[in-house]
Regions:
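Active-site-adjacent betaalpha module
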Residues: 28-31, 35-36, 61, 65-229
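Short catalytic/ligand-binding loop motif for oxyanion handling, primarily in non-cytosolic enzymes
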Residues: 49-53
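Short, flexible, mixed-charge acidic loops at enzyme active sites
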Residues: 55-60
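Short acidic, Gly/Ser-rich segments with clustered Asp/Glu that frequently serve as metal-coordination loops
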Residues: 2-8
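Active-site loop signature of alpha/beta-hydrolase-fold enzymes
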Residues: 4, 48, 194
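A general structural signal for short secondary-structure boundary/capping elements
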Residues: 42-45, 210
C-alpha cells in the first residue's frame, strides 16, 4: 500500500477502495495480528537499476507512458519503471521529490499515510517484529525463488493472510502463486481493495473462497483473535 498506489499526489481517490481497506487494516486486522503474535510482512515494490534493466516488456508496458492513454492511464503518472516522478504534494502542505517509479528508497515507493507510522511501530517490537520485503513483479512469489519465499521458509510460515492493493493484481498474483506452492491462503476481503471495476474484486473473492483457500474479513479476524486470547 505504497504512495504510488494510494496518494492523491498520483491522482488516487482518497475515498477509494484501497483507502477503505487501509482503514480496516489499521482499525481491526493489524492490532489483531499483533495481539495474536501473527507476523506482519510488508511486501512492496522496491526495484534496483539491474532489475529495471532486465524487466520484461509486458511489465514495462504496464507502468509505462507509451500507450498509457489506450488503457485509461495518466501518462504523467505512469512514467515507466524507474522513471522520475518529479515533485509531488506530500499531503502535509509541502512538496517532496517523488523519485524513480517504484525504486527502492523513493518516496513514491514508501508506505502511504498512517501506514508508515504503523510499520515503524511494528518493526520495533521485541517479539515477531514487522518485516519489509521487496518485490520486483506483481507477484512476490513468482518464479523459482524470491525474497518473500526465502523469508517464509526460514521462519517456517505456511499459512498466509492476504491484504493490500490491488486485489486483482499484486495481491491476487501473490495469492495464486502461494496457493500453487502449497501455502494455506486466506484473503481478508475488506482488507484488500482495487481501482479496477467491482467485478474484479468479486472475482478474486469468489475464487479465493472456492478454489485457492479461504475468505474472511478484518472484523471477523479480530473477533476470532479476541475469542482465542
Amino acid at each position: 500500500m505504497q504512495n504510488f498506489f494510494l496518494s492523491p499526489a498520483f491522482g488516487r481517490n482518497s475515498q477509494g477502495p484501497g483507502h477503505k481497506a487501509m482503514g480496516q487494516l489499521i482499525q481491526h486486522a493489524i492490532p489483531a495480528a499483533r495481539k495474536a503474535g501473527v507476523r506482519i510482512v510488508w511486501v512492496n515494490w522496491g526495484l534496483t537499476e539491474d532489475q529495471v534493466e532486465s524487466m520484461p516488456t509486458s511489465m514495462l508496458r504496464t507502468f509505462g507512458a507509451v500507450g498509457a492513454e489506450d488503457t485509461g492511464k495518466d501518462g504523467s503518472v505512469y512514467v515507466g519503471l524507474g522513471g522520475e516522478t518529479g515533485m509531488r504534494d506530500d499531503g502535509k502542505g509541502g512538496e517532496v521529490e517523488g523519485g524513480g517509479l517504484l525504486m527502492r528508497g523513493a518516496w513514491n515507493s514508501g508506505l502511504y499515510g498512517e501506514l508508515e507510522k504503523v510499520y515503524e511501530e511494528g518493526r520495533k517490537l521485541e517479539s515477531n517484529p514487522d518485516v519489509w520485503v521487496h518485490k520486483n513483479r506483481m507477484s512476490a512469489l513468482w518464479g523459482g525463488r524470491t525474497e518473500l519465499e526465502e523469508f517464509l521458509e526460514e521462519e517456517g510460515i505456511r499459512s498466509l493472510l492476504f491484504t493490500g492493493v490491488n486485489t486483482d493484481q499484486c495481491v491476487g498474483g501473490t495469492l495464486q502463486d502461494a496457493f500453487s506452492k502449497g501455502y494455506d491462503c486466506i484473503l481478508l476481503g475488506n482488507g484488500a481493495g482495487t481501482s479496477s471495476p467491482a467485478f474484479a474484486q468479486n472475482c478474486m473473492e469468489y475464487n479465493a473462497q472456492k478454489s485457492w483457500g479461504f475468505v474472511a474479513d478484518c472484523e471477523g479476524f479480530a473477533k476470532g483473535v479476541e475469542q482465542m486470547t
